Regions:
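His/Asp/Glu-enriched, well-ordered alpha-helical/loop segment
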Residues: 72-82, 89-112, 116-117, 122-126, ...
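Extracellular/periplasmic ectodomains of large secreted or surface enzymes and adhesion receptors
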Residues: 276-277
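Metal-coordinating catalytic core of metallo-dependent amide/deamination hydrolases
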Residues: 1-88, 127-134, 189-191
Length: 277
């Protein structure tokens, strides 16, 4: 329906501060928690079909040519696109598609996004930076750290790479991936900070970020990912008065207690819309 959207004057950014058209969501690849993401190296598990350790996940439905066409069509229409992709092998296909689209039709400040980008490498992140993409990374280690076991401990340091992406200057946005993990921002922030599961196991401590950085990812990072950093993401003169009042300072409490912080008040557009006990 891209033609119909364009004919109606609709596109990424259309709307107002309450309701706005965002990116087009696309899928390329499979699931991290379902152990179906497509990888270059095999999972650290036995392939139930062969009895061998030769399971690489499930290849995407789209061929490279089909993916190239999809990304270019959305890009040419002037939309931002956010593409679900988890495994390093499927992400590499996606980067190839973005590279071709941008070479064919250069566009500055496109902010195309990869949703999840769960298993990567330094080389993949370098391409992400060069293509000026935004990463919307998982923060669900608290509930789903055990799902990372199938990928092998050697890979944990290159999964959900918030630390490395930030250090490289790649824009990172926070999210709950609700439906897979709970839409509880303070729990999500704790997960970014500790990389520790509910059972107390740490997965990839190299990718921990500070509470201050995690808050920024969830505020300014998320606002940037939808072209709203000039009106949202921080409390400043000239921006919308959207903020929450917390029961404690997440930068001051023990990191394993961040999840217990509650919302005392929510203010939207300068008006109180929620007050807790």
């Amino acid at each position: 329906y891209l033609d119909e959207f364009r004919a109606g004057g609709l596109g990424t950014g259309f709307g107002n501060s309450w309701v706005k058209v965002g990116p087009i969501k696309a899928h390329h690849g499979n699931s991290l928690s379902g152990r179906t993401a497509w990888l270059f190296e095999p999972y650290d598990m036995v392939n139930p079909a062969t009895g061998e350790r030769d399971y690489y996940g499930i290849p995407p439905d789209q061929t490279q040519s089909e993916l190239d066409s999809l990304i270019f069509t959305i890009h040419e229409a002037g939309f931002q696109v956010g593409v679900h992709s988890n495994g390093d092998r499927e992400i590499t296909m996606l980067l190839d598609a973005f590279e071709k689209a941008l070479a064919r039709l250069p566009r500055s400040d496109h902010r195309h996004r990869i949703e999840h980008a769960s298993v990567v490498s330094p080389a993949i992140l370098q391409r992400v930076k060069e293509l000026e993409l935004v990463l919307v990374l998982h923060s669900y280690v608290y509930e789903h750290g055990d799902k990372m076991e199938a990928f092998g401990a050697d890979r944990w340091s290159m999964m959900h790479t918030n630390r490395l992406a930030l250090d490289m200057g790649i824009p990172v946005a926070g999210n709950s991936d609700y439906g897979v993990s709970a839409a509880i921002p303070m729990l999500r922030i704790q997960s970014l900070v500790t990389r520790t599961s509910a059972e107390g196991k740490v997965y990839g401590p190299e990718q921990r970020i500070s509470p201050e950085e995690a808050i920024r990812v969830w505020t300014m990072g998320s606002a940037y990912s939808v072209f709203e950093e000039d009106i949202k993401g921080s409390i400043e003169v000239g921006k919308l008065a959207d903020f929450v009042v917390l029961s404690s300072d997440p930068t001051a409490v023990p990191v394993d207690e961040i999840k217990d912080i509650t919302i005392r008040m929510t203010v939207v557009g300068g008006g109180i819309v929620y007050e807790g006990n």
